[in-house]
């Protein structure tokens, strides 16, 4: 995968040189470049200007963004604008982006964008109902969530399949050594070696956590008969 990021602050992306994204680069599975679009700005390197019609703040000008993208050597990229008014980012969205060969991210600052920038864009993405100072943190989040889904990036192809949201449910609780820590013990079922009982316990715990913390996810979840019975059992136990 090739990723190009347009930003006024390339140095903010240093964390992507580490952990999973850094390993993806080392394996040759990811090629990532940062472009300071101030370098392409006309008018004394100004990237922002006052909005026509008046209003608060400054807007990102179209010219630096257009010129930066036009010099990037790509074929058919997904061009992503980070915008609080965009489509909410989800695990399913990350899975979709992980299938792409080329991604371009536009990280804004200031009050907003000249609307004409959006003629370049294929996707407008938001992390949620809040506003960040710029698009850099959002871009890093999306890159991390996407790159880890590229085949061969994680140690095992199944490593991400049990993650929260990948199945549509929140992930079940997990434990490691020691068995007893300060009086808190590992559930006996996980020590039993009985694979079917462990599977059912994990499924029930996933359903329980999702029901208690994110019931909205269950509204669009496609239940199997087994899952429906387990959820009914959970609801009855909780009263």
From Swiss-Prot:
Q: Which protein family is named in the record? A: Belongs to the RNA methyltransferase TrmD family.
Catalysis performed (reactions): guanosine(37) in tRNA + S-adenosyl-L-methionine = N(1)-methylguanosine(37) in tRNA + S-adenosyl-L-homocysteine + H(+)
- Please give the subunit comment from the record: Homodimer.
The function of this protein is:
Specifically methylates guanosine-37 in various tRNAs.
Q: What is its main location?
A: cytoplasm
Q: What's the Enzyme Commission number for this chain?
A: 2.1.1.228
Localization terms from the record: Cytoplasm
Q: So where does this one cross the membrane?
A: none
Q: Name one GO cellular component term.
A: cytosol
* Alphabetized InterPro entries for the sequence: Alpha/beta_knot_MTases, tRNA_m1G_MeTrfase_C_sf, tRNA_m1G_MeTrfase_TrmD, tRNA_m1G_MTases_N, tRNA_MeTrfase_TRMD/TRM10
Q: Provide an example Pfam family for this protein.
A: tRNA_m1G_MT
Q: Which GO terms describe its biological process?
A: tRNA N1-guanine methylation
HAMAP family found in the cross-reference section: TrmD
Residues at which S-adenosyl-L-methionine binds: 108, 127-132
What terms describe the molecular function in GO for this protein? tRNA (guanine(37)-N1)-methyltransferase activity
- Which lineage ranks, top first, belong to the organism behind this chain? Bacteria, Bacillati, Bacillota, Bacilli, Lactobacillales
Which of UniProt's keywords are assigned here?
A: Cytoplasm, Methyltransferase, S-adenosyl-L-methionine, Transferase, tRNA processing
Name used for this protein in its record: tRNA (guanine-N(1)-)-methyltransferase
* SUPFAM superfamilies xrefs: alpha/beta knot
